[in-house]
């Protein structure tokens, strides 16, 4: 099932105090194969130039996610978020980034996918299909939304799965997400936490610790 050559990358989302060029050069010297970033439009050209200069793979762009819940509602707010994510897809294509990591939902109170949401995500899927960008839908809270997207768009070439080990432990309560979506695996996030620490799941459980610590 999982055949091929795999490359190991690391988050380049900031915090080092280094320039993009110096940061990527350091990762290359240490032995990383690639890196992923957030969607910082002011630095996209720098990321691409550094990846090419040091023969590194720019593996993915993590799309904005704080407003994704509005995509499941009718109306302008959801359409605006959808438009933003479509632009992120276009930037992935323009800067030769093969995967856009995307959250299907954010929040812990709602659990009902809607037709409006599926239409909005359908616009993103169609754009990614046309541009050859793989969408790595991440296992986060709200598994119902991930399931609905996979059911609706199963036959689309852009539909992919980004497996987050830490999210599986806390947000998914240890459920085997690879058993559900491993056939579409296109990206991974390896990190750790201590599981659900209270009666209810909350984002503070998602500690993003180094694995094994």
PLM regions: where:
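N-terminal pre-domain/capping segments
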Residues: 1-87, 93
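Hydrophobic faces of well-ordered beta-strands that scaffold small-molecule active sites
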Residues: 6-12, 35-37, 58-63, 100-102, ...
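Active-site-proximal loop/turn and secondary-structure-junction residues that shape catalytic pockets
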Residues: 14-16, 41-43, 62-67, 104-108, ...
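Active-site-adjacent beta->alpha loops and helix N-cap segments on the catalytic face
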Residues: 41-50, 109-118, 144
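Surface-exposed, active-site-proximal loop segments in enzymatic domains
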Residues: 64-83, 106-116, 200-210
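An active-site-proximal structural segment forming one wall of the substrate-binding cleft
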Residues: 75-99, 117-131
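Active-site groove signature of glycoside hydrolases
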Residues: 88, 92-112, 131, 136-140
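Acidic/histidine-rich catalytic cores of soluble enzymes
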Residues: 122-212
């Amino acid at each position: 099932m999982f055949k091929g050559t795999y490359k190991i990358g690391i988050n380049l989302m900031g915090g080092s105090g280094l320039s993009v060029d110096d940061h990527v050069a350091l990762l290359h010297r240490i032995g990383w194969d690639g890196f992923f970033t957030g969607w910082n439009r002011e630095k996209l050209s720098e990321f691409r130039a550094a990846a090419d200069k040091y023969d590194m793979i720019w593996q993915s762009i993590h799309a904005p996610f704080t407003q994704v819940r509005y995509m499941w509602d009718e109306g302008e707010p959801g359409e605006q978020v959808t438009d933003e994510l479509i632009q992120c897809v276009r930037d992935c294509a323009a800067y030769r980034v093969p995967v856009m990591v995307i959250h299907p939902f954010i929040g812990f109170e709602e659990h009902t996918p809607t037709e409006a949401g599926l239409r909005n995500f359908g616009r993103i899927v169609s754009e990614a299909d046309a541009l050859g960008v793989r969408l790595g839908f991440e296992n986060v809270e709200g598994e119902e939304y991930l399931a609905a997207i996979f059911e609706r768009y199963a036959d689309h070439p852009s539909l992919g799965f980004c497996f987050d080990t830490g999210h599986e432990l806390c947000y998914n309560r240890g459920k085997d997400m690879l058993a559900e979506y491993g056939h579409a695996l296109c990206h991974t996030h390896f990190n750790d936490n201590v599981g659900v620490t209270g009666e209810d799941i909350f984002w503070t459980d998602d500690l993003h610790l180094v694995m094994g610590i």
